[in-house]
């Protein structure tokens, strides 16, 4: 099921430490001061960081209706996800992995302690 911008924003901001910010002059979301994601207004796609260019290429091949890239992102481990094709579970999965990579360890410990 397609996500609205409001639903996407609610999911992104549900991660501990997430806040609205800017990246290179564009509205974005960060965990503390580290880039988390952003919505590209040009094509209504969410910028998602992945572990490698190989992973990105696999995603592009496996789900071309959902994932794409532009020339700007060709040399980066980044994939663009079309918001109208993206579901909440998939988005949470990508964001959780990214959050674990960039959130300070103290924040991660505090967040995980709340789940117990």
PLM feature segments, named:
Residues 1-116:
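Charge-dense, helix-prone N-terminal extensions
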């Amino acid at each position: 099921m397609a996500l609205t911008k409001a639903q996407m924003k609610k999911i992104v901001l549900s991660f501990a430490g997430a806040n609205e910010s800017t990246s290179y002059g564009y509205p974005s979301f960060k965990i503390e001061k580290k880039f988390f994601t952003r919505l590209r207004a040009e094509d209504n796609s969410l910028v998602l960081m992945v572990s490698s260019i190989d992973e990105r290429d696999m995603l592009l091949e496996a789900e071309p209706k959902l994932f794409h890239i532009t020339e700007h992102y060709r040399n980066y481990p980044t994939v663009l996800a079309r918001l109208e094709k993206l579901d909440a579970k998939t988005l949470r999965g990508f964001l959780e992995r990214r959050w674990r990579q960039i959130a300070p360890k103290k924040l991660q410990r505090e967040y995980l302690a709340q789940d117990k």
